[in-house]
């Protein structure tokens, strides 16, 4: 029995975040032996916070499991919460989806995308908005909902981006971006447009993909994170792909981009890789940096 957090995340060095899948912004510094951590995306917290967020379990459940790990209590399998059943998983997805409305210019979701320089006149059907959704951390917040589709084009789960009350930024919480529980097939993504032929781009995050689409004037889909991006496959009939990687200090985003590019190129596809010039930037950063230059021109 173990909590399940990978050991390479717990070495007091910058590396992958077990919560948000960032590749080099997490560090477990274990101050005063309390398991403290900090992540550029998720924020900071203590060891119990990390364990609860990683497992989705409550404080008493985690405390009980740690007691068992330390030998303070005998491990009884029936004391551990069983994994969510498929019926429960689908019910949870339907319940969240039922609360959503079309993402339009009158919603706080639009205000959020405008704040990121990527407001649209009309948003893709894969993006919707929930005015008030439970965030899994004791709060209720506005939320942008994204449908994640599998490599066969079938919907597999939902991705949630929780927003501030005014919609002008992500919510001030440890994990404002969350996938719904359950397995996600390799190659899944958020299709931010219908594929009608021609070149197609792929990026990590939703905002990153929308920004790359603005800058390069082509459709770009979102793979959610670097790990999912390198496993992505383009839709049938697509033989030209532009890969938009993040410029990570430890090269995680670049590595994922080039691994994907290599795999697709070996299959005979025409592939280009694009990385922002500035270290630490993704394509939304690049877009926001370019906007003042465009306005001054």
Language model segments and positions:
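Phosphate-handling DNA/RNA-contact segment within nucleic-acid enzymes
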Residues: 135-236
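Alpha-helical elements of the RecA-like P-loop NTPase motor core of helicases
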Residues: 49, 111, 210
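N-terminal structured subdomain of primase-like DNA metabolism proteins
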Residues: 1-75, 120, 237-239, 265, ...
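Compact soluble domain cores
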Residues: 105-122
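Conserved active-site segments centered on acidic
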Residues: 61-103, 155
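Short, basic/aromatic recognition patches
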Residues: 119-139
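Short gly/pro/ser/thr-enriched loop/turn and capping motifs at secondary-structure boundaries
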Residues: 60-62, 69, 109, 228-231, ...
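TOPRIM fold recognition
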Residues: 38-45, 197-201, 206-297
């Amino acid at each position: 029995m173990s909590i399940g957090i990978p050991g390479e995340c717990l070495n007091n060095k910058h590396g992958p975040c077990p919560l948000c899948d960032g590749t080099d912004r997490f560090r477990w510094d274990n101050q005063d032996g309390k398991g403290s951590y900090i992540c550029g995306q998720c924020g900071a917290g203590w060891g119990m916070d990390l364990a609860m967020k990683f497992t989705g379990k409550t404080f008493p459940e985690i405390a009980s499991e740690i007691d068992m790990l330390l030998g303070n209590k005998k491990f009884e399998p029936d004391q551990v919460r069983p994994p969510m059943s498929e019926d429960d998983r689908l019910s949870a997805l339907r319940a969240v989806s039922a609360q959503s409305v079309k993402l339009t210019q009158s919603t706080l979701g639009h205000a959020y995308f405008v704040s990121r320089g990527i407001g649209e006149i009309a948003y893709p059907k894969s993006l919707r908005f929930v005015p008030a959704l439970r965030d899994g951390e004791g709060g209720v917040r506005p939320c942008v909902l994204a449908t994640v589709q599998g490599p066969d084009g079938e919907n597999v789960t939902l991705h949630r981006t929780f927003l501030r009350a005014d919609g002008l930024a992500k919510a001030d919480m440890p994990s404002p971006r969350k996938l719904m529980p359950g397995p996600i097939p390799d190659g899944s993504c958020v299709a931010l447009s219908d594929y009608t032929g021609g070149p197609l781009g792929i990026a990590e995050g939703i905002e990153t993909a929308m920004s790359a689409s603005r800058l390069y004037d082509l459709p770009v889909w979102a793979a959610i994170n670097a790990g999912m991006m390198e496993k992505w496959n383009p839709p049938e009939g697509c033989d030209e792909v532009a890969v938009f990687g993040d410029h990570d200090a430890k090269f995680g985003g670049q590595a994922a981009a080039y691994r994907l590019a290599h795999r697709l190129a070996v299959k005979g596809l025409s592939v280009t890789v694009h990385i922002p010039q500035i270290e630490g930037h993704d394509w939304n950063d690049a877009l926001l940096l370019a906007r003042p230059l465009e306005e001054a021109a």
